[in-house]
């Protein structure tokens, strides 16, 4: 793919972003495309499409509801609390 200033102008129009230095942008985009083309040359024939480094090592637990009193424990440390809520000073009149 050839990256030149006319392509940069088209991208500028499509993205609705003003590009001041079109020549520099064309050079940068050409380098990016060249890098991606290098990646396309990699031999991935021996790599499974579903390859993962995790090997299902994520521990899954049973999702069981547990009754606890976390709210009460937290509110015990609050300066003021009532009916399960923090009581704070009024700051807006």
From Swiss-Prot:
Keyword ATP-binding included in the entry's annotation: yes
A molecular-function term among this protein's GO annotations: asparaginyl-tRNA synthase (glutamine-hydrolyzing) activity
Enzyme class, spelled out: ligase
Keywords assigned: ATP-binding, Ligase, Nucleotide-binding, Protein biosynthesis
Gene Ontology biological-process annotations: glutaminyl-tRNAGln biosynthesis via transamidation; regulation of translational fidelity; translation
E.C. number: 6.3.5.-
Catalytic reactions on record: L-glutamyl-tRNA(Gln) + L-glutamine + ATP + H2O = L-glutaminyl-tRNA(Gln) + L-glutamate + ADP + phosphate + H(+); L-aspartyl-tRNA(Asn) + L-glutamine + ATP + H2O = L-asparaginyl-tRNA(Asn) + L-glutamate + ADP + phosphate + 2 H(+)
Function, as annotated: Allows the formation of correctly charged Asn-tRNA(Asn) or Gln-tRNA(Gln) through the transamidation of misacylated Asp-tRNA(Asn) or Glu-tRNA(Gln) in organisms which lack either or both of asparaginyl-tRNA or glutaminyl-tRNA synthetases. The reaction takes place in the presence of glutamine and ATP through an activated phospho-Asp-tRNA(Asn) or phospho-Glu-tRNA(Gln).
Subunit structure: Heterotrimer of A, B and C subunits.
NCBIfam families, per the entry: gatC
UniProt similarity note: Belongs to the GatC family.
Protein name per UniProt: Aspartyl/glutamyl-tRNA(Asn/Gln) amidotransferase subunit C
Species, as recorded: Nautilia profundicola (strain ATCC BAA-1463 / DSM 18972 / AmH)
């Amino acid at each position: 793919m050839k990256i030149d200033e006319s392509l940069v102008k088209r991208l500028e129009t499509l993205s609705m972003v003003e590009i001041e230095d079109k020549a520099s942008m064309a050079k940068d985009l050409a380098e990016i495309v060249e890098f991606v083309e290098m990646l396309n040359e990699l031999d991935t024939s021996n790599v499974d499409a579903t390859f993962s480094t995790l090997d299902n090592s994520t521990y899954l637990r049973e999702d069981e509801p547990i009754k606890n009193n976390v709210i009460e424990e937290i509110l015990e440390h609050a300066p003021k609390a009532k009916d399960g809520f923090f009581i704070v000073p009024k700051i807006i009149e």
